[in-house]
Amino acid sequence: MEKTVKKVKRIEGSLRVPSDKSISHRAIILSSLADGTSIVKNFLKAGDTLTTVNAYRKLGVEIVEKEGVYYVHGKGLDGLKEPDDLLDMGNSGTTTRLTLGVLAGFDFFAALTGDDSLRKRPMKRVAEPLSKMGAKIDGRKDGNLLPISIRGGKLTGIDFFNEKMSAQVKSAILLAGLFAKGDTTVIEPVISRDHTENMLNSMGAYVSREFTKDGYRVTVKKADKLNPIHINVPADPSSAAFFAAAASIISGSHIELKDVLINPTRDGFFRKLKEMGAKVEYKNKRDEAGEIVADIYISYHELKGVKVEPQEVPSMIDEIPLLAIIATQAEGETVITGAHELRVKESDRIKSVIENFKRLGLEAEELPDGMIIRGKQKVKGGIVDSYKDHRIAMGFAILGLVSEEGITIKDADCVYISYPEFFNHLEKVSK
């Protein structure tokens, strides 16, 4: 599907964007391992997260939806069953990597595959540490690419340095650690999103966390059981970011974004937006299952270019393409470095942004690990390629709002991966 987004006068209104994708995934996965029934409200019902639901049903977990609430009848830490068919991971890297961590603890055979995009994404980053712990893993390109087979069993804890600061890698190892003899420790130079630690802690698992001279250090021990949870999944900051960005680049705009997760490992984009000059306020802060939630108010103010340093990247990794896009409207230059992880997302997001900038006649320089974007550029409009990547599609839709002739996005239906109602919501707040 192609979608054209045209210039608007302003952005105005109040939205509750879809629930957080990361927490929705983890709520299903961890609840599947709990003793008893977990209740998950405000679950994100989108392509990636429904992949997780389907995968754990194939592993023998009863997951029932009633009036938008998901009831997960956990099987305990020894209750998953060998699947009788391939587990299809769709487009979801999170489902794949975290599930490999879970399956490492079970002495049965499973094979995972995915769509064209997912079959190109690197899996050795989790396969290697899980193999060191004792799992038997094989796949294409020496275990780096799907399809991948795994047979888990007796695991031993390891100390792992998470150089890439990937929350998916960390989570896979910590989940395997629930089944492993001894301590399992992950060290990161800069803390990546910590929802797995928060949720495990709330379910009664042993989770030790500290900041040392080497960085962030988290340890789990073998668990006897996980307690079921009742959780209201907060709104996704990565989805909220698109509307915050729109309000910050269109004069006279202001928007309220309700119930947004503002975990410090996830709200880097909003902090950077404030640094650029936008008016950003957190109101009505509250706690939800160990996570901080707030209503966010954003108003237009002229933006200035900024530097995004490598240590800032993990807290805004999914929003960096969007930041690059709105940087074209800021005063001065924006420099982004240390974002090499963008190369192995649903698309090569650095290349995707740069190529689309070229199509629109916008000036930017591609770096191996980031971008340099010239500010205050007029956007005439044109046709861009989403590369079937939901965040690229939504990011360039936001740029369409300030374009002279509109921006047409190819394969725009990929937004279903995380935000099925995106274009409807965009229309709702466009004036």
From Swiss-Prot:
Catalytic activity, reaction form: 3-phosphoshikimate + phosphoenolpyruvate = 5-O-(1-carboxyvinyl)-3-phosphoshikimate + phosphate
The UniProt record lists the keyword Iron-sulfur: no
Active site (UniProt): D318 (proton acceptor)
One GO biological process term: amino acid biosynthetic process
Localisation per UniProt entry: Cytoplasm
Chain sites annotated for binding 3-phosphoshikimate: K21, S22, R26, S166, Q168, D318, K345
EC number: 2.5.1.19
GO CC terms, sorted: cytoplasm
Alphabetically ordered keywords of this record: Amino-acid biosynthesis, Aromatic amino acid biosynthesis, Cytoplasm, Transferase
Main EC class the enzyme belongs to: transferase
Pfam family, one: EPSP_synthase
UniProt-recorded Gene Ontology molecular function terms: 3-phosphoshikimate 1-carboxyvinyltransferase activity
The name this protein goes by in its record: 3-phosphoshikimate 1-carboxyvinyltransferase
Upper taxonomic lineage: Bacteria, Pseudomonadati, Aquificota, Aquificia, Aquificales
